[in-house]
Amino acid sequence: QYVCMFRRGHELDGRKLTLDAFRKADHVVAVSAGTGHGIVDEFMKKKGVQRKVRLTVPHFVAIGHILRSTDMIATVPERYADECLEPFNLTAVNHPVALPRIGINLFWHAKFHREPSNQWLRGLIFDEFSDK
């Protein structure tokens, strides 16, 4: 499930996020073509939902840092937003577009499959972000 995330005190904070406000806002987007996350971008494009993309980043890790000091908003997985809200003084609201539920997969090279440190990291990621 995806939400919209932005800094506390943003002009959208405390209001229901409408589709019109979503379209008018400046967006930061994690470029994720060919992944589950990329499907969200493709879905919105097919539905005719245009965004004012002001910045693209190669991964979600940068988004919290960017949002806390700008007026941009981002479409992010709800589980990711939950981890970013307090550390970056952000808020998350329901997404104005009815997005489909999308499965996100974790991949690794076969040669690392039995490596203890890789197993530990995969387990940590699974425990933190899976719906179990």
Describe the role of every protein-language-model region.
Residues 5-10, 104-114:
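A bilobed periplasmic-binding-protein/Venus flytrap-type ligand-binding module shared by bacterial periplasmic
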Residues 12-19, 25-47, 78, 114-118, ...:
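Secondary-structure junction motif
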Residues 29-31, 50-59:
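Short beta-strand-to-loop elements that line the ligand-binding cleft
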Residues 1-6, 13-16, 42, 91-93:
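Short beta-strand-centered segments that line the small-molecule binding cleft or hinge
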